[in-house]
Structure formats: structure tokens, C-alpha cells
């Protein structure tokens, strides 16, 4: 979005952006000529508390690397270190750290957040939704990717980018490496790779694939014995809630 707006941002992210990878670069880092640096900060090692951003953005708080009370403490410090702090009002825990609800975003149409995504639809590998009467179409899948886009749009609007520019930019969005990445189709079976590793993310990845196929067979590769043991009950709860009778999940 910021590149489409002519801001030439620098980027440090986790996974590589497909468009940057196509340029022959590593994909998750790029130096731009503009004044903005976009960082995907990491709470897993606590290093996020060392950042003092102009704008801090929080999409969700879910049990992952630490217990919830530890995560709330870490993100509370991050909030205090941010000049402006924007949260997802549709996430129960994230909204508790709201600085100003009018700067926040939500996918709940009854929310009082300043930026609300409405009329979400997924047609195959494409999603669409509306924000303030502007229609957004993205070549991606899943409601969670609508929330990701909504978060980026909210921040962009805070620094002067209009919704039309945001919509135009997202029409050409090419995705991120191993984030709902379509690898191909064999004998009518779509193969999709996703790095989802905690209970909520795994459930979201499965739900995103369901409109594409009558049956989803998910293969889950845990990060290790410790994290799997730590999150076992949450995995069962979240994944069971989204599986249809015909769907399957396997662990390898």
C-alpha cells in the first residue's frame, strides 16, 4: 500500500513477500528511499518491548509462545512505547489495550471502531469486503486475511493514504511465502502451504480452505514437542470447532 502511495518504505518482515522474491531478493527485507520503516515485530522472545514506533499495530493476542498474562504484559509495554497504538477490536484481548477506539479496526459490524470491514465474501481464491463504502478485492483466502488487510489499511489511512489508493494496491497483492500459498493442483486436488503453527492460526488456515473444496485434508507439522504439549488442549478446541464432518487433520 505504501509503495502504491509513492512513500517508498523500507521493510523488515518475517516471511518473504512474493513480489520482492520475484525481484531476486530474499523477500523479507528491502531498503526504500522513504522515511517509513515497516517492521513485523516478534513477541516470542520479548524483543518487541525494545521498539518505540511512531505507530504500533496489534492484530490479536492468542496463547502461543507464552501464557496469556505474559503476552498481555509484553504488549502493554509495546503500547506504552508507541506514539499511536492501533488494535483489532474484534479480538477479545487485543481490544483491552485500545488507546483510542476511533483509530482501531474491526470485522464486527456492530463495533464502534473507526475502520470496519463489512460484507466479507470468499469466491474461490479471492476475497472481497467493504470499508466506508469502498470495495476491496484481494487474491487471497480466509477471513483472517481480510483482518490482515484491514489492519494495514487502517495504518495507511492514519498516515494520509486514501481508501482508493489502498484498494488499488491490494488488487495487485501477490501474497507472502508459505502463507496460504497455492502450490498447484493435481488430479483436481489443490495443494496449499501455510505456516500456521498455533491453534487459532491452524483453525483459520483450515477455515480459509473450506470454500475452495468440499473436503479439506490438513497435515500439521508441529514445531516441537514442548510447544505442542503446551498448546495441546487449545489445538483440540480450536480445530474441532472449524472441522466439517468430511474434513480430516493429520499430524506428522
Model-found features: residue ranges?
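Switch II (G3) loop of P-loop NTPases
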Residues: 35-44, 191-197
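Active-site beta-alpha connecting loops in nucleotide-dependent enzymes
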Residues: 176, 207-252
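Acidic, Mg2+-coordinating active-site environments of NTP-dependent enzymes
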Residues: 4-7, 18-19, 23-26, 33-34, ...
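Short beta-strand "acidic-cap" motif of Rossmann-like dinucleotide-binding folds
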Residues: 10-12, 38, 104
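Short beta-strand segments
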Residues: 12-13, 40, 59-60, 88, ...
